[in-house]
């Protein structure tokens, strides 16, 4: 099983990952339990890797965003960003396509979304009807420039490991290119492809596979120290 880190400093980084052969074709409302499973969190090791990777280029990043956040202002800044994301994405949240969560322990925001809303089965081309959602997210990201954006894409276990990994990476590139056209600062952005390696639910059922075909968009504050 292979996991890749894609660092793409000249493009943007929202990653949609999906099943190789079995994305949901019909949209349905997700239950509260299913939404909770989609929200989830990456493991401590994975989040630590994100932070460590960003810290290696922290000096250039702070300069590029005009200085880092400090003190109590960090929590307030991220709270406001979470509220604006929730406000902008209310239709998608009501349909069960997107969730937004604020983690108080590290001031991280997690935007989770179902893969089927962004791509058709086996496709790496964004659905035209989904670009308005991406526009909303890009608008908020541009309003809150003192953050980094790390996107982790996931698939279910249908298909080979290699196919699922490649599919997630190609879908990442499609969204990265879209966000680049929306002027999100490239130095803030990176993406990981996880393929099928981190399921949130049982791949033995269609409901579980639908939950595993997801995207986790992590937004972290740029700290001055």
Question: Where do the model's predicted regions map?
Answer:
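Bacterial N-terminal signal peptides that target proteins for export
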Residues: 1-8
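C-terminal motif of bacterial Sec signal peptides marking the signal peptidase cleavage site
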Residues: 14-18
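Short, low-complexity, glycine-enriched hydrophobic/amphipathic alpha-helices that associate
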Residues: 22-84
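Extracytoplasmic/secreted proteins, especially bacterial periplasmic and envelope-associated proteins
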Residues: 37-38, 45, 60, 64, ...
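Amphipathic, membrane-active segments
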Residues: 79-108
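Extracytoplasmic
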Residues: 95-97, 104-108, 114, 121, ...
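Periplasmic peptidoglycan-binding/anchoring modules of Gram-negative envelope and division proteins
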Residues: 118-153, 180, 210-212, 217-220, ...
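Periplasmic OmpA-like peptidoglycan-binding domain that tethers envelope proteins to the cell wall
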Residues: 154-225
């Amino acid at each position: 099983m292979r996991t890749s880190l894609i660092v793409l400093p000249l493009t943007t980084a929202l990653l949609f990952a999906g099943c190789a052969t079995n994305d949901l074709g019909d949209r349905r409302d997700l239950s509260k339990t299913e939404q909770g499973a989609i929200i989830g969190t990456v493991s401590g090791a994975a989040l630590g890797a994100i932070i460590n990777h960003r810290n290696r280029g922290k000096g250039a990043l702070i300069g590029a965003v005009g200085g880092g956040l400090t003190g109590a202002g960090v929590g307030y800044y991220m709270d406001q960003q979470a509220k604006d994301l929730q406000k902008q994405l209310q239709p998608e949240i009501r349909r069960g396509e997107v969730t937004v969560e604020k983690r108080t322990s590290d001031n991280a925001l997690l935007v989770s979304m179902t893969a089927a809303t962004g791509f058709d089965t086996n496709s790496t081309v964004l659905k035209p009807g989904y670009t308005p959602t991406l526009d909303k997210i890009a608008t908020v990201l541009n309003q809150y420039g003192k953050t980094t954006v790390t996107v982790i894409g996931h698939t279910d276990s249908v298909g080979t490991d290699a196919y699922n990994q490649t599919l997630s990476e190609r879908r990442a590139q499609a969204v990265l290119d879209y966000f680049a056209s929306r002027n999100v600062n490239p130095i803030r952005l990176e993406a990981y492809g996880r393929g099928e390696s981190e399921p949130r639910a049982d791949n033995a059922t269609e409901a579980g596979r639908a939950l595993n075909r997801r995207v986790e968009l992590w937004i972290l504050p740029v700290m001055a120290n």
